[in-house]
Design a protein with these regions (language model features):
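Extracytoplasmic metal-acquisition and chelation regions
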Residues: 1-149
């Protein structure tokens, strides 16, 4: 089926990422399911920082230490431009922001779940030192559109 093909495609793309780079850092916990399914450690920055109303220097310090200890390769924004908080963490930690946003919690781009899965997978894979086969991902999206016509 198409969804099994999508799952296999994601596994194949993820396999191109060095194992030590398989850490997804984003603001919320929304990527936990994806991380569990495809072998990533996931880190929710809000778990470290608390909500923005309680932002304290020691929280920022522990977050910066975690980013360094985990050898994090990218921070994944959920919007572009990234929030001031993520931009500041990126600057202070020297961990780059991913060039594309990831779509979470119903914050959908124009499209559907296959398009979102392909987009998020390529964003994650390319940002963490892997190589995403965008052409085969686009083929999966085309199959989805044919089914939904």
């Amino acid at each position: 089926s198409l969804l099994e093909g999508l799952d296999s495609w994601i596994v194949e793309q993820v396999s191109s990422i060095p194992e030590e780079n398989r850490v997804i850092v984003s603001k919320h916990k929304a990527m936990e399911y994806y991380g569990d399914a495809f072998g990533f450690e996931t880190v929710s920055l809000l778990d470290f920082l608390g909500d923005s109303s309680s932002l304290r220097p020691e929280n920022i310090s522990s977050t910066l230490n975690m980013l360094k200890e985990e050898n994090v390769k990218a921070i994944f924004p959920e919007q572009i431009p990234a929030s001031k908080l993520l931009r500041n963490l990126s600057r202070q930690s020297s961990v780059p922001l991913a060039s594309n946003q990831i779509f979470v919690d119903g914050l959908m781009m124009d499209g559907n779940m296959v398009s979102v899965a392909v987009h998020n997978t390529c964003t994650i894979v390319d940002s963490l030192g892997g190589s995403c086969d965008k052409e085969s991902g686009s083929n999966l999206e085309s199959e989805w559109y044919k089914l939904s016509d």
